[in-house]
């Protein structure tokens, strides 16, 4: 019988330290989804390099990680600014020539504008924060990943880039571009040992999108908004990011995973004559 000597997936060395010794760059890693990703990656042994525009939240994440016995460092930069991002990348790569994990988490929901009231300035703002920052960060670190034999890129975008979104078509378009970038980059980088995947969050509590304070009195409706029957939290996104960053997903690339409690699968956007707007969150059961 002919024996086939095909490469096999590497065994998992320590299930409690899935990123042991790997250098992980997390943009927007100070708070919210990025903060949870930074903490969880450090818990699993990664050396976490946090890039954030807010020094206070970046340093707080580093302090939390170090207090728990992890390794992290904060860098202050606006990822919409190419020169700032290049400067931080130079600092990181001078200490760690090879980055194994890159999480492009920077993004924003604001300014939310209906298309008829939008302007070229608002379009550019959406582009800069939701697409340019992702592409620029990837450009800064991808050569080091190739030189080091590969790695994993995880792009955080939105479920609204994976379905129709009537609220703000420009926002939806930028998130769709991020999802497409993830898929296309995966195809071109696979032979370099780099996997690229995206995460599309929805209904997740963050400082940027505060469902808790804006839904006071409506908590009982969450079970109607998401099939899993609850609000999402940054930790929900971080756990999927850990899967995609680690060898658990060694055969997964080019995919965009909705981490949304089932909202994409279970519901769409419908026009409410009573509210005179599109909604996917009914006000009554």
Regions found by a protein language model. Give the residues of each.
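Alpha-helical segment proximal to the catalytic Tyr-Lys
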Residues: 143, 187-188, 250
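Active-site helix of classical SDR
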Residues: 138, 174
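Substrate-binding pocket helix/loop in short-chain dehydrogenase/reductase
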Residues: 113-115, 119-127, 222
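The beta1-alpha1 cofactor-binding region of Rossmann-like NAD(H)/NADP(H)-dependent oxidoreductases
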Residues: 55-56, 76-87, 120, 235-236
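Short, small/polar-rich loop/turn modules that mediate ligand/substrate recognition or access, typified
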Residues: 190, 195, 252-254
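Conserved glycine-rich cofactor-binding loop
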Residues: 23, 30-32
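Residue(s) in the substrate-gating loop at a strand-loop-helix junction
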Residues: 158
């Amino acid at each position: 019988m002919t024996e086939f000597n095909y490469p096999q997936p590497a065994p998992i060395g320590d299930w409690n330290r899935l990123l042991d010794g790997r250098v992980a760059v997390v943009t927007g890693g100070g708070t919210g989804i990025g903060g949870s990703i930074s903490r969880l990656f450090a818990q699993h042994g990664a050396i976490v390099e946090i890039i954030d525009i807010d020094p206070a939240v970046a340093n707080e994440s580093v302090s939390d990680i170090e207090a728990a016995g992890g390794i992290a460092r904060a860098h202050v930069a606006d990822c919409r600014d190419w020169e700032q991002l290049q400067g931080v990348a130079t600092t990181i790569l001078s200490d760690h020539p090879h980055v194994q994990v890159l999480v492009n988490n920077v993004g924003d929901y604001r300014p939310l504008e209906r298309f008829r009231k939008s302007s070229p300035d608002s379009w550019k703002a959406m582009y800069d924060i939701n697409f340019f920052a992702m592409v620029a960060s990837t450009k800064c670190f991808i050569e080091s990943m190739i030189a080091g034999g590969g790695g994993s890129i995880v792009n955080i975008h939105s479920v609204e880039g994976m379905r129709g979104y009537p609220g703000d078509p420009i926002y939806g378009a930028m998130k769709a571009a991020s999802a497409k970038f993830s898929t296309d980059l995966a195809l071109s980088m696979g032979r370099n040992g780099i996997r690229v995947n995206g995460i599309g969050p929805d209904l997740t509590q963050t400082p940027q999108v505060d469902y808790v304070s804006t839904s006071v009195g409506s908590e009982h409706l969450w079970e109607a908004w998401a099939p899993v029957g609850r609000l999402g939290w940054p930790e929900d996104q971080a756990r999927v990011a850990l899967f995609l960053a680690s060898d658990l997903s060694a055969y997964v690339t080019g995919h965009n995973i909705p981490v949304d409690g089932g909202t994409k699968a279970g519901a769409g956007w419908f026009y409410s004559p009573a509210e005179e707007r599109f909604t996917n969150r009914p006000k009554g059961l």
